[in-house]
Design a protein with these regions (language model features):
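A short, aliphatic-rich alpha-helical micro-motif
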Residues: 60-61
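Entry/capping segment at the start of metal-dependent catalytic domains
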Residues: 1-29
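Active-site-proximal helix-loop-helix substrate-binding element of RNase H-like nuclease domains
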Residues: 18, 29, 35-53, 64-179
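Short alpha-helical segments and helix-capping/turn motifs at coil-helix boundaries
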Residues: 10-13, 51-55
Length: 181
């Protein structure tokens, strides 16, 4: 990624999986050019407390690079479903696919490393939760305690933490992509 190009590393939280979702509760993203994190929701429009989801969707659409974990399988299709105008032209980088490509033997790697704090059921998994343990950027337990029906500040904080984990994962894969590993 060139210096002037805008990369958006993002995640979203919605009220269900693709088939059932009718609302995106929040979007958080890290702008690689500005080196800044942003969060968006539709909970307090016009009160200066948040920017609307459509603003985030427009920023993502205009980015030169769109980076996230499972964004090809979930996030981008969901945005397209709920915001039909969404038509990104930037390069899409899915860290889930990079993980499967570059770490196809993840179970063996995890067994060799014998992670001190990672639960055994996460060994061999390409999930963001598993990578949070591997990279020392734990994503939190919010997802285990919610039904996803309503927005909450805890949900938005969880979304932002997912972006932090994805940033670390993107940094991990960058040497693979530029040929230095």
């Amino acid at each position: 990624m060139a210096e002037k190009e805008i990369g958006i590393i993002f995640d979203l939280e919605a009220n269900g999986l693709y088939k059932d979702a009718t609302e995106i509760h929040c979007i958080s993203y890290y702008d690689t050019a500005a080196e800044e994190m942003f969060s968006f929701n539709d909970q307090c429009p016009g009160k200066g407390l948040s920017s609307p989801i459509t603003t985030a969707v427009q920023y993502i659409q205009q980015a030169d690079y769109i980076i996230g974990h499972n964004i090809i399988g979930y996030d981008l299709p969901l945005i397209r479903k709920l915001y039909p105008f969404f038509n990104p032209t930037g390069v899409i980088v899915d860290t889930l696919l990079l993980s499967r490509l570059y770490h196809s033997r993840l179970m063996s790697i995890d067994k060799e490393r014998n992670w001190k704090h990672m639960p055994l059921q996460l060994y061999g998994r390409h999930s963001l939760e598993a990578y949070g343990y591997r990279l020392g950027e734990y994503k939190g337990a919010f997802s285990k305690d919610t039904d996803w029906k309503e927005w909450s500040q805890e949900m938005e904080d969880y979304c932002t933490q997912d972006v932090n984990v994805t940033r670390r994962l993107w940094k991990h894969f960058t040497p693979y992509l530029n040929g230095s590993r």
